[in-house]
């Protein structure tokens, strides 16, 4: 009973971080199952496993997207790593609002329940994660499925807003003595920028889906031309949230990768301040490019020219980060342990995803490529290999600190190589399919596309084998069997530890710091 009370009512940032990780893992497995069903359907031309039910196919697409974005990447990145390590990294005893932290987590399971029930009610919600009207309107989706999905989004949105308020307050007000803003570890900076993005973008989404809800149920016509509304207004509102959202998913990953590259190159991060201002620039510019998702809806030519240029400008701070990671590794004494493998894999694959993004930024090219598999390949290279590789990298980097036990290195490396091979085999052929004109969200296709689709589906099965390997690693590491106890600082940085988590025991005590640490200087800015 006391154990149950501890986990239900916990206000400890480490306990809540662990809950987020468990929740993210469960949602991630479910989302992966949906993605495998999608790839099984697309393995060959014609109807395969769904019996020609095209609505069901789109329900799978929608559920896969929502699960992966709102219930896997965000809870694990921001809720898991953020809760676990932000207070430790800044020398704080806990988060600023511990009970708010608790409710932020416990809003997510009901939200997940609502999402899953939306897939089971009537014919499900087959709108895609964008939930565009008129497809999501009451005439096209007459049951309660879309309403349930909207309520699910509302709940997870409230959870994220409360969490971001908590992170902003914690980072601004609870830094230990001597921890100035310019001494903050890059992961903390990444969470801070992410929290601001959430705080500014989610209310816009909430407004859009609330208007959609009233259009569906109370006869308003916000998005219905018959009553003077405009479905394009919904697209503007959604993407004003949706584009910052993709940076919300990747920015904490940037912070994690910076720590790992620095640790395993035995060097401080190249251009610390440049890295910080690059993240802030990405955050600001992320709000100024939303209509590049809408080049095909009839925007004015000048508008398209602006959004093309603004989208390309985002590549500049992103490039600064990529080249700073490479410069950090340059001349370093690099150790290719599992976290570093995932970090290098991240840099390579994220760069490919970024380059295809530059292609899609051109409004003329995007008109040809919009809603084809080229776009699917692009954002999966950025997310399925960017955000997810950063998650795995962070797990292997900090797992000793979390569990207090070392992970099996060989199994970790096997996990990396299987996953690396699997995801590339899944998503690289999609570029060719997109360039050949294969449209997204359609469960059948002409025979001409059969070869690349078969290869892509085979790659997804390999990825599943890699994910199974990962859970084997988790099981071995968390059990008190053969693997040895983890040192305070497992990566041999004890001579010159750069961040505070390597100065506390593994796992940290329930109350991390007996007394608050005082920061005299950091490697980032040793002249302070």
Swiss-Prot record:
<comment type="subunit">
    <text>Component of the cytochrome c oxidase (complex IV, CIV), a multisubunit enzyme composed of a catalytic core of 3 subunits and several supernumerary subunits. The complex exists as a monomer or a dimer and forms supercomplexes (SCs) in the inner mitochondrial membrane with ubiquinol-cytochrome c oxidoreductase (cytochrome b-c1 complex, complex III, CIII).</text>
</comment>
<protein>
    <recommendedName>
        <fullName>Cytochrome c oxidase subunit 1</fullName>
        <ecNumber>7.1.1.9</ecNumber>
    </recommendedName>
</protein>
<comment type="similarity">
    <text>Belongs to the heme-copper respiratory oxidase family.</text>
</comment>
<feature type="binding site">
    <location>
        <position position="443"/>
    </location>
    <ligand>
        <name>Ca(2+)</name>
    </ligand>
</feature>
<feature type="transmembrane region" description="Helical">
    <location>
        <begin position="414"/>
        <end position="434"/>
    </location>
</feature>
<dbReference type="InterPro" id="IPR000883">
    <property type="entry name" value="Cyt_C_Oxase_1"/>
</dbReference>
<feature type="transmembrane region" description="Helical">
    <location>
        <begin position="312"/>
        <end position="332"/>
    </location>
</feature>
<feature type="binding site">
    <location>
        <position position="247"/>
    </location>
    <ligand>
        <name>O2</name>
    </ligand>
</feature>
<feature type="transmembrane region" description="Helical">
    <location>
        <begin position="269"/>
        <end position="289"/>
    </location>
</feature>
<dbReference type="InterPro" id="IPR023616">
    <property type="entry name" value="Cyt_c_oxase-like_su1_dom"/>
</dbReference>
<keyword id="KW-0496">Mitochondrion</keyword>
<dbReference type="GO" id="GO:0005743">
    <property type="term" value="C:mitochondrial inner membrane"/>
</dbReference>
<feature type="cross-link" description="1'-histidyl-3'-tyrosine (His-Tyr)">
    <location>
        <begin position="243"/>
        <end position="247"/>
    </location>
</feature>
<keyword id="KW-1133">Transmembrane helix</keyword>
<keyword id="KW-0812">Transmembrane</keyword>
<dbReference type="GO" id="GO:0020037">
    <property type="term" value="F:heme binding"/>
</dbReference>
<keyword id="KW-0460">Magnesium</keyword>
<keyword id="KW-0472">Membrane</keyword>
<dbReference type="InterPro" id="IPR036927">
    <property type="entry name" value="Cyt_c_oxase-like_su1_sf"/>
</dbReference>
<dbReference type="InterPro" id="IPR023615">
    <property type="entry name" value="Cyt_c_Oxase_su1_BS"/>
</dbReference>
<keyword id="KW-0813">Transport</keyword>
<dbReference type="GO" id="GO:0015990">
    <property type="term" value="P:electron transport coupled proton transport"/>
</dbReference>
<feature type="binding site" description="axial binding residue">
    <location>
        <position position="380"/>
    </location>
    <ligand>
        <name>Fe(II)-heme a</name>
    </ligand>
</feature>
<comment type="function">
    <text>Component of the cytochrome c oxidase, the last enzyme in the mitochondrial electron transport chain which drives oxidative phosphorylation. The respiratory chain contains 3 multisubunit complexes succinate dehydrogenase (complex II, CII), ubiquinol-cytochrome c oxidoreductase (cytochrome b-c1 complex, complex III, CIII) and cytochrome c oxidase (complex IV, CIV), that cooperate to transfer electrons derived from NADH and succinate to molecular oxygen, creating an electrochemical gradient over the inner membrane that drives transmembrane transport and the ATP synthase.</text>
</comment>
<feature type="transmembrane region" description="Helical">
    <location>
        <begin position="447"/>
        <end position="467"/>
    </location>
</feature>
<comment type="pathway">
    <text>Energy metabolism; oxidative phosphorylation.</text>
</comment>
<keyword id="KW-0999">Mitochondrion inner membrane</keyword>
<feature type="transmembrane region" description="Helical">
    <location>
        <begin position="148"/>
        <end position="168"/>
    </location>
</feature>
<keyword id="KW-0106">Calcium</keyword>
<feature type="binding site">
    <location>
        <position position="41"/>
    </location>
    <ligand>
        <name>Ca(2+)</name>
    </ligand>
</feature>
<feature type="binding site">
    <location>
        <position position="46"/>
    </location>
    <ligand>
        <name>Ca(2+)</name>
    </ligand>
</feature>
<dbReference type="GO" id="GO:0022904">
    <property type="term" value="P:respiratory electron transport chain"/>
</dbReference>
<dbReference type="GO" id="GO:0006119">
    <property type="term" value="P:oxidative phosphorylation"/>
</dbReference>
<keyword id="KW-0186">Copper</keyword>
<feature type="transmembrane region" description="Helical">
    <location>
        <begin position="66"/>
        <end position="86"/>
    </location>
</feature>
<keyword id="KW-0479">Metal-binding</keyword>
<feature type="transmembrane region" description="Helical">
    <location>
        <begin position="186"/>
        <end position="206"/>
    </location>
</feature>
<feature type="binding site">
    <location>
        <position position="370"/>
    </location>
    <ligand>
        <name>Mg(2+)</name>
    </ligand>
</feature>
<keyword id="KW-0679">Respiratory chain</keyword>
<feature type="transmembrane region" description="Helical">
    <location>
        <begin position="379"/>
        <end position="399"/>
    </location>
</feature>
<feature type="binding site" description="axial binding residue">
    <location>
        <position position="378"/>
    </location>
    <ligand>
        <name>heme a3</name>
    </ligand>
</feature>
<feature type="binding site" description="axial binding residue">
    <location>
        <position position="64"/>
    </location>
    <ligand>
        <name>Fe(II)-heme a</name>
    </ligand>
</feature>
